[in-house]
């Protein structure tokens, strides 16, 4: 028993060195990309914003079928028609992911009409942009139901079949606010932090599930209607991301089987700073960068 324990202690650091070296080499050499030609992709919140750009990106890269879920039929119709004109089979279903029964019902309808889903992109989200004391209780609940619990329901609906097929990918379009919250968006930050923990646990739980993996994307502020009006102190230094950039990098991560993606890459520094700086220093960074007051001009949509 002692020798086995000592052997494990010796092997473990060697494994770490190998894995770090492998990752470093992978950053230099072009990785092997996943072929999407046989994949059926379902995108929640797929009618507009990042969801629409994700549909375009998957279609351009040869996805076999694309399914869009959302609450606004007009937007879903527009995106569906655009994807069909690109030559890709596309369907849409009106579905509120915050409604568990509706998710399970629509998932059944998708399987009957379209077939098996092999890539699930949890993109749907809402934000109300208020402090805790200014927030309506129902609005707070809605954020948790859509942004967090909605991912529980969609994943439970589609993951079992992926495991049977030994082919699947769960994608979470999260936010860097999951790691660094700001005032004025307490509902959104809380729900995104919870969704991040959900994906972290799910990703580890899939380690011994061949052919099935997960990707979490944490982008900085993106120039969509959702956060319209949000302003940082130095917009030229911290410009918002373009939704097409987020979509492109997300599909890259799926094809490369990348578990975690922060956008832009400088957001990785945020993790380091939060682990080494005292709270007072972190608070001063929020004041200096303008994130402390960036939601004061918020006009976005829910």
Curated annotation (Swiss-Prot):
Disulfide topology: none
Sorted UniProt keywords: Lipid metabolism, Membrane, NADP, Oxidoreductase, Transmembrane, Transmembrane helix
Expression tissues: In the embryo, expressed in developing osteogenic and chondrogenic tissues of vertebra, rib, tooth and limb bud.
List of residues binding substrate: 175
PANTHER family in the record: PKSB, SHORT-CHAIN DEHYDROGENASE_REDUCTASE 3
Family, as annotated: Belongs to the short-chain dehydrogenases/reductases (SDR) family.
Role description: Catalyzes the reduction of all-trans-retinal to all-trans-retinol in the presence of NADPH.
Name listed for the protein in its UniProt record: Short-chain dehydrogenase/reductase 3
Species per Swiss-Prot/TrEMBL record: Mus musculus
Taxon lineage: Eukaryota, Metazoa, Chordata, Craniata, Vertebrata
GN (gene name): Dhrs3
């Amino acid at each position: 028993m002692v020798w086995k324990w000592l052997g494990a202690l010796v092997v473990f650091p060697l494994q770490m060195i190998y894995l770090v070296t492998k990752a470093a080499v992978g950053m230099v050499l072009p990785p092997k990309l996943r072929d999407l030609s046989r994949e059926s992709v379902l995108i929640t919140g797929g009618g507009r914003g990042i969801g629409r750009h994700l549909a375009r990106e998957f279609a351009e890269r040869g996805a076999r079928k694309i399914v869009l879920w959302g609450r606004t039929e007009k937007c879903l119709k527009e995106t569906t028609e655009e994807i069909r004109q690109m030559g890709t089979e596309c369907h849409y279903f009106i579905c509120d992911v915050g409604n568990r029964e509706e998710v399970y019902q629509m998932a059944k309808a998708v399987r009957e009409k379209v077939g098996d889903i092999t890539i699930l992109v949890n993109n749907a989200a809402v934000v109300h942009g208020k402090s805790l004391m200014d927030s309506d209780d129902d609005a707070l609940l809605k954020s948790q139901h859509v942004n967090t619990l909605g991912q529980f329901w969609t994943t439970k609906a589609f993951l079992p079949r992926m495991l049977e097929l030994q082919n699947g990918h769960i994608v979470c379009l999260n936010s860097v606010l999951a790691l660094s919250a700001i005032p004025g968006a307490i509902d959104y930050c809380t729900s995104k932090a919870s969704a991040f923990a959900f994906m972290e646990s799910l990703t580890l739980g899939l380690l011994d599930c061949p052919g099935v993996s997960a990707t979490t994307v944490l982008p900085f502020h993106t120039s969509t209607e959702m956060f319209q009006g949000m302003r940082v102190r130095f917009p030229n230094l911290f410009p918002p991301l373009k939704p097409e950039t987020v979509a492109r990098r997300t599909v890259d991560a799926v094809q490369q089987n990348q578990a975690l993606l922060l956008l832009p890459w400088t957001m990785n520094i945020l993790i380091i700073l939060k682990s080494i700086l005292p709270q007072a220093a972190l608070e001063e960074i929020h004041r200096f960068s303008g994130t402390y007051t960036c939601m004061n001009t918020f006009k976005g949509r829910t």
